[in-house]
């Protein structure tokens, strides 16, 4: 199955953007201008399945899928880098991370609505579940807008594979249910999808980011 996602930043998302990503407050109008320019390039969607048919996962209820922002953001970032506009490329990365975190939340709500179950935990491959599941998930979902390289890299770059543990009981707010947070601080560098998960859960915490 496939669903369109429409992640956007709200006024609250801008309140601590500069402190979180170490920009001067004077840069915010320029950052917002880049956001306005990139938003039409976002073609976010999710490919997913509610079938419990993955080898190696024994949960009674789960869903799995890919969430992507599409190729446009990658192309804009590459364009800036080609012109040695490093700050602009960094701004695109920062904004796209927040957009990806919004897409995760939107996707989780889609799964809850369609399954009639509640999200108990959101996991990313490489954390609770092995990256060895990636080819199997890719084969089952056959996402036409997402590629998988021989090195098991997903393209576009702002794409993640997720396992959503579902339950009949209602759980806490979605932001408390991402298991990436338990391992995030063990790494000096982390992929954009994983970082977006951490941003999603800890929107109030400023920190340094290493790409």
Locations of regions flagged by a protein language model:
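General structural feature for long, well-ordered alpha-helical segments within catalytic domains
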Residues: 30, 34-38, 103, 107, ...
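Catalytic cores of large soluble enzymes that bind and process phosphate-bearing ligands
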Residues: 23-26, 30, 91-95, 99, ...
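Conserved mixed alpha/beta catalytic, RNA-binding, or beta-rich assembly cores of soluble enzyme
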Residues: 59-126
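Short secondary-structure junctions and interdomain/linker hinges
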Residues: 38-49, 98, 102, 106, ...
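Short terminal or interdomain "cap/linker" segment that borders an active site or interface and mediates
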Residues: 118-190, 196-211
């Amino acid at each position: 199955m496939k669903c369109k996602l429409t992640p956007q930043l709200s006024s609250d998302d801008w309140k601590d953007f500069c402190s979180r990503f170490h920009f001067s407050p004077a840069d915010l109008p320029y950052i917002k201008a880049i956001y306005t320019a990139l938003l039409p390039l976002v073609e976010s969607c999710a490919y997913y399945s509610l079938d419990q048919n993955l080898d190696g996962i024994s949960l009674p209820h789960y869903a799995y899928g890919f969430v992507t922002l599409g190729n446009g953001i990658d192309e804009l970032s590459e364009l800036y880098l080609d012109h040695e506009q490093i700050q602009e490329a960094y701004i695109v990365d920062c904004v796209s991370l927040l957009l990806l975190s919004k897409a995760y939340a939107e996707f989780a709500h889609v799964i809850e609505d369609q399954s009639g179950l509640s999200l108990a935990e959101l996991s990313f491959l490489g954390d609770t579940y092995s990256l060895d599941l990636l080819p199997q998930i890719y084969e089952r979902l056959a996402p036409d807008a997402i590629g998988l390289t021989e090195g098991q890299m997903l393209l576009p770059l702002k794409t993640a594979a997720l396992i959503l543990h579902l339950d009949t009981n209602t759980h806490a707010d979605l932001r408390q249910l991402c298991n990436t947070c338990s391992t995030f601080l063990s790494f000096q560098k982390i992929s954009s999808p994983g970082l977006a998960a951490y941003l999603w859960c800890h929107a109030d915490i400023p920190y340094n980011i290493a790409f």
